[in-house]
A protein has these predicted regions:
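Short, flexible loop segments at the rims of nucleotide/cofactor-binding pockets, characterized by
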Residues: 47-49, 100-104, 132-136, 196-197
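Short internal beta-strands
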Residues: 70-74
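Portal/gating segments that form or line small-molecule/metal binding sites
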Residues: 76-132
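Class I SAM-dependent methyltransferase SAM-binding "motif I" and its flanking Rossmann-like core
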Residues: 125-203
Length: 267
């Protein structure tokens, strides 16, 4: 089978081995506990690099022994390389991995967006062009369905465009010539700056925008570092390397304050 045929035809793929240590977080056992966990709205982001450790952590957050995790590569224009990388990153984990492309035709797509997106335990959004991602989601009503997913306790997440999309606004490379700003879904209040350590222009622009009041205070994440939110509360800061950091950036007495948030290592 050709690679492109594999990508377009493989709406659901199954991979498996095991979550780290076989651990399942509290809330997965008793029926009452599972209901309680489902009412908590969860988002897991990374500044860049939503790879196997982050996917493993998301799987644990679902509270399921073998969760269904779906990749939504809209921002990357349904890149075949990104989809293949998704399955490769899921391969060591005991998850049921799938993906849903956005560039579809009614003759090829039998299920509605809600039937697909609301039937899984976690949704990971790709990096890419955030501006295009937002426009496509709104045109299809995917933005509203993602809100339903969040409200139902389906774990949402991603890196780069896949982290920025959940906030009210943030910095983006989605337009020609220079970094700019983009308005997003607003599930998480405030702003976001991904790739904080990886792209030279990100930090000074973010400081300028927050300092001038053009952008709300928010969270900056290095590549390989991220945040787990329950509702709009930071519950845990994580990283996959020692020098990857997360910061809260705000305006205090007319000055930009960058506060480093201690991160826990995940593997």
């Amino acid at each position: 089978m050709k690679r492109r045929e594999f990508i377009t035809s493989s709406v659901a793929g199954t991979v498996g081995a095991g979550l780290a240590g076989g651990a399942t977080p509290a809330g997965a056992g008793e029926a009452g506990e599972a209901v309680q966990a489902a009412t908590t709205r969860k988002i897991l982001i990374a500044g860049g690099g939503f790879n196997t450790p982050f996917i493993r952590y998301m799987a644990q957050l679902t509270g399921k022994a073998r969760p269904k995790l779906l990749f939504l590569p809209t921002a990357s224009a349904d890149s075949p390389q990104g989809i293949i990388a998704w399955y490769r990153n899921c391969a060591p984990l005991n998850v049921e991995a799938s993906h849903q492309i956005s560039f579809i035709a009614s003759t090829q797509q039998a299920k509605g967006w809600d039937e697909v997106l609301l039937s899984v335990d976690g949704i990971v959004c790709s990096g890419g062009n955030t501006l295009n991602q937002q426009v496509i989601w709104k045109a299809h009503g995917i933005d509203a369905i993602l809100r339903q997913a969040w409200d139902r306790g389906i774990v949402l997440g991603g890196a780069s465009a896949g982290s920025l999309c959940w906030f009210e606004e943030g910095t983006t490379d989605s337009r020609p010539k220079e970094l700019s700003t983009v308005q997003c879904l607003g599930f998480l209040k405030g702003s976001h700056c991904p790739h904080y350590d990886a792209e030279a222009g990100r930090r000074p622009l973010y400081h300028k925008l927050v300092g001038s009041g053009q952008m709300k205070p928010g969270y900056a994440c290095d590549n390989d570092a991220g945040i787990y939110f329950e509702d709009n509360t930071v519950k845990r800061v994580v990283a996959t390397r020692a020098d990857a950091d997360v910061f809260h950036v705000s305006l205090v007495d007319g000055k930009v304050v960058e506060k480093k948030l201690p991160a826990e290592r995940i593997d």
